[in-house]
A protein has these predicted regions:
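Short loop-beta-helix segment that forms the pyridoxal 5′-phosphate
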Residues: 2-23
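Active-site nucleophile and cofactor-binding loops and adjacent substrate-binding regions
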Residues: 12-18, 42-45, 148, 153
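PLP-dependent aminotransferase-class I/II
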Residues: 15, 41-101, 107
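Catalytic cores of nucleotide-enabled group-transfer and carboxylate-activating enzymes in metabolic
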Residues: 20-27, 34, 38-42, 54, ...
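Generic beta-strand/beta-sheet core signal
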Residues: 42, 67-69, 91-96, 118-123, ...
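Catalytic PLP-binding core of fold-type I/II PLP enzymes
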Residues: 102-141
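Active-site C-terminal subdomain of aminotransferase-like
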Residues: 149-187
Length: 187
């Protein structure tokens, strides 16, 4: 997953892609210690992902989830650029989007980072064999559904949500991390 997304760290998976997407919002909320409570979601994000994010945060009165009402040209993300501000914790896009379109995310990444917000890219892992990686666009987190990697469907499942991020976010990352390291003695 790290090779496909260009990220430094990946966890040992979530229940599904929508759960991984919602966990990215949890990470962003903790990253800003609850001071930034605005989530900007592209209207071309998968509706199940959007609904899972809303379900995760339905008990929070002060979380603002915006982006549904924004129209315009997907190719430029200009309308999303206008609603990213200093209260924004996270900017969420899907790549390719829910309609299968491929957009240049460079301007959106620059705007998100100019406002110190995190950029999350929900992606199809198969498409990343041909497209630029989320890290190439400057994404802080990449997540999505791992089922397209060859998991056969059986009575509505199984699915797995992948979640990868930059090294700076590893301490706030949900899930198990599996890896190899050295102990205090260097062994």
């Amino acid at each position: 997953i790290c090779s496909l997304t260009g990220m430094a760290v990946s966890n040992a998976s979530h229940y599904d892609g929508a759960t991984a997407a919602a966990e990215a919002c949890v990470l962003a909320l903790h990253n800003f210690r609850g001071k930034r409570k605005k989530f900007v979601l592209s209207r071309y994000l998968h509706p199940h992902y959007r609904q899972t994010i809303k379900t995760y945060f339905q008990g929070y009165d002060d979380i603002i989830i915006t982006g549904d009402e924004v129209g315009g040209d997907l190719q430029s993300h200009e309308d999303l650029l206008d609603i990213v501000d200093t209260d924004t914790a996270i900017v969420y896009v899907q790549y390719p989007d829910f309609l299968g379109r491929i957009a240049d995310l460079t301007a959106l990444a620059e705007t998100a980072h100019a406002h110190k917000a995190l950029l999350v890219v929900v992606c199809n892992p198969i498409s990343l064999g041909m497209l630029k990686t989320p890290a190439d666009y400057g994404a802080d987190i990449a997540c999505g559904e791992g089922q397209p990697l060859g998991i056969p469907l059986n009575f509505g499942g199984p699915y797995l949500g992948f979640f990868a991020c930059k090294q700076e976010q590893v301490r706030r990352m949900a899930g198990r991390l599996v890896g190899q390291t050295l102990d205090a003695r260097g062994e």
